[in-house]
Curated annotation (Swiss-Prot):
This is tRNA modification GTPase MnmE. K(+) binds at residues 234, 253, 255, 258. Mg(2+) binds at residues 238, 259. Its cofactor is K(+). Belongs to the TRAFAC class TrmE-Era-EngA-EngB-Septin-like GTPase superfamily. TrmE GTPase family. It comes from Deinococcus radiodurans (strain ATCC 13939 / DSM 20539 / JCM 16871 / CCUG 27074 / LMG 4051 / NBRC 15346 / NCIMB 9279 / VKM B-1422 / R1). Residues 224-371 form the TrmE-type G domain. (6S)-5-formyl-5,6,7,8-tetrahydrofolate binds at residues 31, 92, 131, 443. Exhibits a very high intrinsic GTPase hydrolysis rate. Involved in the addition of a carboxymethylaminomethyl (cmnm) group at the wobble position (U34) of certain tRNAs, forming tRNA-cmnm(5)s(2)U34. GO terms for cellular component: cytoplasm; cytosol. It is found in: Cytoplasm. One of its GO terms (molecular function) is metal ion binding. It is an enzyme of class 3 (hydrolase).
C-alpha cells in the first residue's frame, strides 16, 4: 500500500486526545495510544495495580494525579496491541466529563511524553495496522455523524465489512477471469481452454451497477434531502409543511399569496434527514415581490431532490402556470382530501393536513422516491470517493466485455485497481489524508 507522507509521519509517537464531545457530561474519556501508552498511564493513574502490569481487556479504578495533585477519580481501561482499536497499546481514562477535568488529564498525558493526536489519527492507525480497511474507516466517521436510523444502520453495515465483502465478491470474479485470459495469452501452445468470460463479466457488471445504484440512497441517507413544496396559491403547501412537522412553522391564511418568500424546516422522514422548503404559490401576478417569489420557487424546485406538487382537490383542476425543470423528480398530491372531491387522479396521493389522512402513505412514498430500489439490508456507497471508484471499475468491466483478450486483460487490471483503491489496498498518496481530514480529534 502507498500512503501519504503526512499520514506516515509520527507513527512511532504516543498520541493522546479527548475522545468525547466538547462540553460537560457525566463521563469523559481521554485516549492514549502508542508504544508508551501504558507507561504514560502509570504516571497519571494510581490504583491497586499499575496499568502497565495489567493484562489487556481489563479496567482499573483509582485516582488521577498530576504529580501530587489529585485531578479526579476514574477508570483506566487497558488494551494491548495488536488486540486494540489502533493495533497498538491503548489506555483509555474515564473521568467525570467536565472540560476542566479533561483538560488537566490531557495536559498530564502530554507532560508525560504523549503528543496531541491529529484529527482522525486513532482511526488512521487502525487502518494502517490492518484493523480496518478504508471503507470501514469511512463508516466510523459515518457513525459519529449519523443523525438518523438509516444513516446509523448503513454506517454500522460499512463498519462490519459488508461493503468490503460486496466489493471483494466482484474482485474475486474479475481476478479469476483475468487469470484465465493471461493463461491463454502466455501459453497458447499449451492449448489452455478459452474459458467463457462473458458470463462472469456480465455478473460483475451487474453487481457493480447494483452497487452504483445504491450511491444515491447512500448520499441521501447521510447528507439529507431537500423537498420543495410547489403549487398554486392556497393549494395547502404551508398547511402540509406544518402537518408533517407536527407544529406550526409556516403562517396559514385563506388569502392567496401569503407565502412570498421560501421557508425551510428540517425533520426526519422515512429515516432520511429532510429539509422541507415551503415556496410561494405559482400564479401570474403583477406584484413584483410575489413574482420574484414565484421565480424563486421554480428555481428551488430545480435544486430539490424531490418536488411535491400540491393541487387542491376541492377545486376544479388547473395546470400549473409555470413548467417545472425537466430534471425534477415529482410526487403529485391531491390536497384537502377531507373536503368533497372536485376531481380524482390515481397517480396523485390524497392527503389532508386537517385530519392527517394520507400522511403515513405520503411518508412512505417520500422514502421510496428518495431511496429508490436500494435494498435496505445491504451496504450502500455513502461517499463520493466510493462512488467514483465503483464508477471507474464499472467502465473498465464494460469495456472488457467488448474487447479482444489482450486489451480485455488490461481493462480488468484497471477495474481491479479501482476496487483496490476503494478498500484502501492500493491507494494514491493523497487519498488517505483526504479521508481522515474530515475526522475530529480523538477518533
Amino acid at each position: 500500500m502507498t500512503f501519504a507522507r503526512s499520514s506516515r509521519s509520527g507513527l512511532q509517537d504516543t498520541i493522546a486526545a479527548v475522545a468525547t464531545a466538547p462540553g460537560s457530561a457525566g463521563v469523559g474519556i481521554v485516549r492514549v495510544s502508542g508504544p508508551r501508552a501504558l507507561e504514560i498511564a502509570d504516571g497519571l493513574f494510581r490504583g491497586k495495580r499499575r496499568p502497565s502490569a495489567t493484562p489487556g481487556g481489563r479496567f482499573l479504578f483509582g485516582e488521577l494525579h498530576a504529580d501530587e495533585e489529585l485531578l479526579d477519580e476514574g477508570l483506566c481501561l487497558v488494551f494491548r496491541g495488536p488486540r486494540s482499536y489502533t493495533g497498538e497499546d491503548v489506555a483509555e481514562v474515564q473521568t467525570h466529563g467536565s472540560p476542566a477535568v479533561l483538560s488537566r488529564v490531557l495536559a498530564r498525558t502530554l507532560d508525560l511524553g504523549a503528543r496531541l493526536a491529529r484529527p482522525g489519527e486513532f482511526t488512521l492507525r487502525a487502518y494502517l495496522a490492518g484493523r480496518l480497511d478504508l471503507t470501514q474507516a469511512e463508516a466510523v466517521l459515518g457513525l459519529v455523524e449519523a443523525s438518523t436510523e438509516t444513516a446509523r444502520r448503513q454506517s454500522a453495515l460499512g463498519l462490519s465489512g459488508a461493503l468490503s465483502e460486496r466489493v471483494a465478491g466482484v474482485a474475486r470474479a474479475l481476478t479469476r477471469t483475468l487469470a484465465a485470459i493471461q493463461a491463454l495469452l502466455d501459453y497458447p501452445e499449451e492449448g489452455v481452454p478459452d474459458e467463457d468470460r462473458a458470463a462472469p463479466l456480465l455478473g460483475a457488471q451487474s453487481a457493480l451497477e447494483e452497487l452504483l445504484a445504491s450511491a444515491h440512497a447512500g448520499r441521501i441517507s447521510t447528507r439529507g434531502a431537500r423537498l420543495a413544496l410547489i403549487g398554486r396559491p392556497n393549494a395547502g403547501k404551508s398547511s402540509l409543511l406544518n402537518a408533517l412537522l407536527g407544529y406550526e412553522r409556516s403562517i396559514v391564511t385563506p388569502l392567496p399569496g401569503t407565502t412570498r418568500d421560501y421557508l425551510e424546516a428540517g425533520l426526519e422522514l422515512a429515516g432520511v434527514p429532510v429539509t422541507l422548503v415551503d415556496t410561494a404559490g405559482l400564479r401570474e401576478t403583477e406584484d413584483l415581490i410575489e413574482a420574484a417569489g414565484v421565480r424563486q420557487a421554480v428555481a428551488l424546485a430545480g435544486n430539490a431532490d424531490l418536488v411535491l406538487v400540491l393541487e387542491d382537490g376541492s377545486q376544479p383542476r388547473e395546470p400549473l402556470p409555470t413548467e417545472l425543470p425537466p430534471t425534477a423528480t415529482v410526487l403529485r398530491l391531491r390536497t384537502k382530501a377531507d373536503l368533497p372531491a372536485a376531481w380524482t387522479d390515481p397517480a396523485a396521493l390524497d392527503v389532508s393536513a386537517v385530519t392527517g389522512a394520507g400522511l403515513p402513505a405520503l411518508r412512505e412514498a417520500i422514502g421510496a422516491a428518495l431511496l429508490g430500489d436500494a435494498t435496505r439490508g445491504e451496504a450502500w456507497l455513502t461517499t463520493e470517493r466510493q462512488t467514483d471508484t465503483v464508477r471507474r471499475a464499472l467502465t473498465h468491466v464494460q469495456a472488457a466485455r467488448t474487447l479482444p483478450d489482450d486489451l480485455a486483460g488490461y481493462e480488468l487490471e484497471e477495474a481491479l485497481h479501482a476496487l483496490a483503491e476503494l478498500t484502501g489496498q492500493d491507494v494514491q498518496e493523497d487519498v488517505v489524508d483526504a479521508v481522515f481530514r474530515n475526522f475530529c480529534v480523538g477518533k
